Amino acid sequence: MVRPDTFNTFQYLSDRVDAELKVTLEDRSMPLYEMMRYHLGWNNSANATQIARIHGVTCLTANQNSSGDMNMALPVAAAVELVDNFVQIHDDIQAGNMTRNGRDAVWWVWGPAQAINAGDGMHALARLAMFRLRDRGVPVDITFQALRFLDDAALAMCEGRFQDLEAQERIDITVEDYLTIAGMKKGSLLACACKLGALLSGRGEEVIEAFNSFGTKLGIAMQIGEDIRQVWESDNDSTAPHNEVLNKKKLLPIVYSIQTAEVREKRRLGEIFMKRVLEPADITTVRSILNELDARRYSESLAEDYRSQAVNDLTTLSIIHKKDKSIDQLTSILTKSMPI
């Protein structure tokens, strides 16, 4: 069980990232930026919401565990958070999600075309936020290395998302394929957040690479947890329950089942996922087959394996104090809704 003070620390770091994001946008008044503020949860409407800045907090946690100065790392924490939000806006358009964080999605309020502008604008702002490092006295070479980390991660994430979409019409995706895609789609940006935090602490390649591995594996664990919820739990933010299943996304429980099923079940799953359009009734059939194959337990076990591996990647680093539980606490919070 995660102690209450852990959540207070997480919220403190999230608030610091939020403040840095507001500075990034404070001088921009065009309605385009109001769309961004709305997505970030800042507008003054009655349904404004507080949103956890997961990637920014991860960045600051890595920085603190590398004995860094958090104030120096705030620009990169804001930058990686902006990239994540750019992806969220595009995700909602792509999947047809009408809501995000309990209220109307940006595209549902302003239309897809303007939402694309808002998302792309956030990506540009992320790169500009990086240059605030120079205002804090960070050397040019470190600033440009940080920018390279961010661009590499954004590109890897796009590659993973491309492969994820390509897989929708295929039934020959293996678990190994899935893990590669999840590492790129979900793990690359979280790994980037970790690398940026370590980089801004002045640590060398060994520490940066350890945090890179930590972030990638934690991202995979988070993706598996999201997949489990899509199959077995209702998602209040979706346009319909199990939206990813209806969109024929190859979630881990489905990939595992197709790969390991006997011919009869394999054929039945193939018939469903080769349909042009899936119907809600198909989900009941899919879930029944997955339950027969114990796909949930397999997925939960693999998620926990990746979470444990992520933490273990950092235990050999001499800079990580054994009594400092912030890494364990971070992974617990980020995976708290995983059914493990």
Label each residue range with its predicted role.
Residues 58, 126, 160, 254, ...:
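Residue-level signal for inorganic ion chemistry
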Residues 1-83, 89, 93-108, 161-166, ...:
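Conserved N-terminal diphosphate/IPP-binding helix and adjacent helical/loop segment
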Residues 113, 117, 153, 157-161:
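Mid-bilayer segments of alpha-helical transmembrane spans in multi-pass integral membrane proteins
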